[in-house]
Amino acid sequence: MGVLASGRRVLAARAQQPGAPANAARVRTIDTSVLRIGFEESGSPQGFPIVLLHGFPDDVRAWDGVVPPLVSGGYRVLVPYVRGHGATRIRDANAPRMAEQAAIGQDLIDFADALQLQRFAVAGYDWGNRAACIAAALHPDRVRGAVLIGGYTIQDTLGAPQPLAPERERALWYQWYFNTERGRLGLAANRRPLCRLLWELWSPTWRFTDETFNRTAPSFDNPDFVDCVIHSYRHRNLGAKGDPRFVDVERRLAMRPKIEVPSIALYGADDGVGGTPPADSPSEREVLTSRIARRVVAGAGHFVPREKPEAVASALLEVMRATR
């Protein structure tokens, strides 16, 4: 299956380093076989664990409004930086910086293994949602329930890409840009202004402040950031080879495996990159076989946990009640 070895449990305090967030004193680290994962932990250590996964371009601050209601509910809340972002590092200095979907999904399982979490609940969006989908589909024994922001987003990275409607292709301009050398150089030279532009385009009704963006922007200074981002968007468009360890996993993902764990699908009504949320369809119900609910969140774009944290927290608590 291409599954990596379980993570080794190593918790440590972290010093400030390039790409570290301003509140680095709150961050802990744990080693897996591939990553040193930076994460924040809140709530009771005895509470049932809930893992919250951010996307690109973002970091753990995306969940600041979601964490408190979960902690009040008695849960243990774990918020890791995904590979290439913030306090998370690829441990081998000579390893290629890859971030295909199978790697991101395995990172979640490795994180849970390193923390000795037999089961957990999960919510994610963007890259984080894809990781949540993959873990729920391939490891249903580990995932109690999931809130999938963006619905089912597992990709077929093996088949020939099919063109979308012109307006959808325009919204994905950044992917075509990243598939060029100019795009790689542009991201390296302009990572903060480019990421801020994506925030503005993807959540057009969200009026975030300079302070909000600046709390997260240092996470884009991670030395693995550019290579991981470029690989992610090239690999999904057949522009880069994947990690040989995940060949079998990508084959399984290309077959659209069902997610049989209880889930709630959330969509931002004003998502500038995902587009207008699709109408409920048999195809989604077919892959989300135990879906509890499907909701379009008014007043939110792509960054739903930042824009409407109460909707995300409420959905998570609903999933937890339904899976007692």
Where in the sequence are the language-model features?
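Catalytic active-site module of serine/aspartate enzymes centered on a nucleophile-bearing elbow/loop
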Residues: 290-324
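N-terminal export signals
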Residues: 1-12
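Glycosyltransferase donor-binding loop in the core domain
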Residues: 58, 221, 301-304
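Conserved HGGG/HGGXW glycine-rich cap/lid loop of the alpha/beta-hydrolase fold
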Residues: 41-90
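A short loop-to-beta-strand scaffold at the N-terminal edge of the catalytic core in hydrolase folds
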Residues: 33-41
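Flexible "cap/lid" subdomain of the alpha/beta-hydrolase fold that forms the substrate-access gate
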Residues: 20-25, 36-37, 49, 85-123, ...
